[in-house]
Amino acid sequence: MKYNSVIRKAIFLRRPNRFQAYVVLDDEELLVHVPNTGRCREILKEGCTVLLRKGTTPNRKTPYDLIAAYKGEVLINIDSQIPNKVVEEALRNKKIEKLVNFNNISREKTFGNSRFDFKLQDDNENTYFLEVKGVTLEENGETRFPDAPTERGKKHILELIEIKKLGMGAGIIFLIQIDNVNKFSPNDETDPKFGEALRLAKKEGVDIFAYNCKVTEEEIELLNSVEIVL
């Protein structure tokens, strides 16, 4: 998907809280919004080049969103709103092989006590719930999730297990917002309970997908499946 707004390059200075950062744009210090509540400490380092997307809301306090950053020469998209859009585009373009038969694609549907990113149905009304997680934590080509403990993430996985037990389809897709990576694993050091839940889900028949993305300064799109090591 192409970014539908003006994109500017800036230099990252600091991040006083989860939602805001200071950058240098056109030789001036500017406060911008960070659409990612994760830590991103290994990405957002003082002096790195970042991409800003012009906001569409008039008179907002932060005129730009910080959506991506260069880690060395590698561009990483950190916008937490992007993964669902990229996955929806991939579903409609039949790029996720196991899910190509699901033509009815609905966003943000509730089952039990959780709201899932997608509810899919095929022509025979078989139902499949899909949860999406954006991944930005990378080291030497290997990626992990989460970068901070996530009770909500574990809850989603346990709900997916229950959906599978009821005879419906269930899956979780880790969308890696980076290009050149070769492996995905749960981040047991940061959140061992999430990793335990993910391994249990695999055992119970929940589908686990991991895909990297083509990331440029103009667009981001789902690219290839990545090896999953649980």
Curated annotation (Swiss-Prot):
Disulfide bond entries: none
Recorded family membership: Belongs to the SfsA family.
Record-linked InterPro entries: SfsA, SfsA_C, SfsA_N
Gene field: sfsA
UniProt xrefs under NCBIfam families: sfsA
One GO MF term attached to the UniProt entry: DNA binding
Protein's name in the database: Sugar fermentation stimulation protein homolog
Taxonomic source organism: Clostridium perfringens (strain 13 / Type A)
